[in-house]
C-alpha cells in the first residue's frame, strides 16, 4: 500500500499485549510474512493499551537517532484467539483444585496489582473523577460508530486497508472492511446496563470491544 520495497525497511516495531500462542517474536513473524528480510530488525512491544502507539514512538526515536532510515511500526492483536493458561501443570498438579486462567484477563484486562480488578473499573473511576456523564459517553460512542460506519461505506480508508482471508470449515472468507462498527445496535446503547459498577456510567457499548485487528505505518526521515 505504501509502495515501499520490503528490503528497504531497516526496522520493524510492533505492539502486542496478548502474544501467548502466537509463536515466538510476533513482530518478526509480521516482518517475514510481509517479505521484509531477516537482516532488518524486529522488536515486539508489550505496553498496556498503547503498545501500537508506543511502537510508533520508538520507531520515530530510531529515525531521529539515525539508526533507521525507514521503519515499519504498528500493532497486532487477536483477542478472540487468546488462549487459556494452566498454571502449575508443567510440574504436575497435586491434591486439591487446579485453576484455568484466561490469558486475555490475566495479562490484559485485569490489574496486576489488584488481582481481579478489571481495567474497565479504572475507566469508571476516571469518569467519576472528571464528571463525565453517561449521556456524554454514550453520545461519544454513537458519534464514533456513525463515523466508522460512514467511513466503511464510502470507502474513506479503502486505500489503507488490506483484505484478510480466513479459512473456515465451510471455505475461505475474505474480510474487506471493519466488522465491529456494524455489530453494534445504536438504538440499544442508551439502555444498556453499566458493566463495572451498579450505578456506573461505563457500558459495553461506550467502552472498548473485544476484537481482533492490526495496523502498520511506514515511517521515514
Question: Which positions does each model-derived feature cover?
Answer:
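Conserved active-site "lid/cap" helical segment
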Residues: 1-22, 26-34, 41, 125-134, ...
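Residue-level signature of catalytic and energy-coupling elements of molecular machines
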Residues: 9, 52, 72, 123, ...
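Conserved catalytic cysteine-centered active-site region
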Residues: 16-71, 113-119, 183-209
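Active-site-proximal alpha-helical scaffold in enzymes
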Residues: 45-77, 127-156, 216-221
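Flexible glycine-/small-residue-enriched beta->alpha junction loops
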Residues: 70-126
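Beta-strand segments within the central parallel beta-sheet cores of soluble alpha/beta enzyme folds
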Residues: 6-15, 41-46, 71-75, 136-143, ...
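N-terminal extracellular/periplasmic Venus flytrap/periplasmic-binding protein-like
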Residues: 136-221
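Flexible glycine/proline-enriched surface loops and loop-helix/loop-strand junctions
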Residues: 107, 124, 128, 197-204
Amino acid at each position: 500500500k505504501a509502495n515501499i520495497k520490503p528490503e528497504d525497511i531497516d526496522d520493524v516495531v510492533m505492539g502486542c499485549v496478548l502474544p501467548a500462542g502466537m509463536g515466538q517474536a510476533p513482530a518478526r513473524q509480521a516482518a517475514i510474512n510481509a517479505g521484509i528480510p531477516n537482516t532488518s530488525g524486529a522488536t515486539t512491544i508489550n505496553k498496556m493499551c498503547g503498545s501500537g502507539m508506543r511502537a510508533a514512538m520508538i520507531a520515530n526515536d530510531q529515525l531521529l537517532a539515525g539508526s533507521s532510515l525507514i521503519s515499519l511500526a504498528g500493532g497486532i492483536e487477536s483477542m478472540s484467539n487468546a488462549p487459556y493458561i494452566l498454571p502449575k501443570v508443567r510440574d504436575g498438579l497435586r491434591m486439591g483444585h487446579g485453576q484455568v486462567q484466561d490469558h486475555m484477563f490475566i495479562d490484559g484486562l485485569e490489574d496486576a496489582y489488584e488481582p481481579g480488578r478489571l481495567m474497565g473499573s479504572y475507566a469508571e473511576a476516571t469518569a467519576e473523577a472528571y464528571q463525565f456523564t453517561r449521556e456524554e459517553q454514550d453520545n461519544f460512542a454513537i458519534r464514533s460508530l456513525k463515523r466508522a460506519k460512514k467511513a466503511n461505506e464510502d470507502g474513506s480508508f479503502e486505500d489503507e486497508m488490506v483484505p484478510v482471508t480466513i479459512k473456515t470449515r465451510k471455505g475461505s472468507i475474505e474480510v474487506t472492511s471493519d466488522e465491529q462498527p456494524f455489530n453494534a445496535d445504536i438504538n440499544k446503547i442508551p439502555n444498556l446496563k453499566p458493566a463495572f459498577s451498579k450505578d456506573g456510567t461505563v457500558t459495553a457499548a461506550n467502552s472498548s470491544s473485544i476484537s481482533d485487528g492490526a495496523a502498520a505505518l511506514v515511517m521515514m526521515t
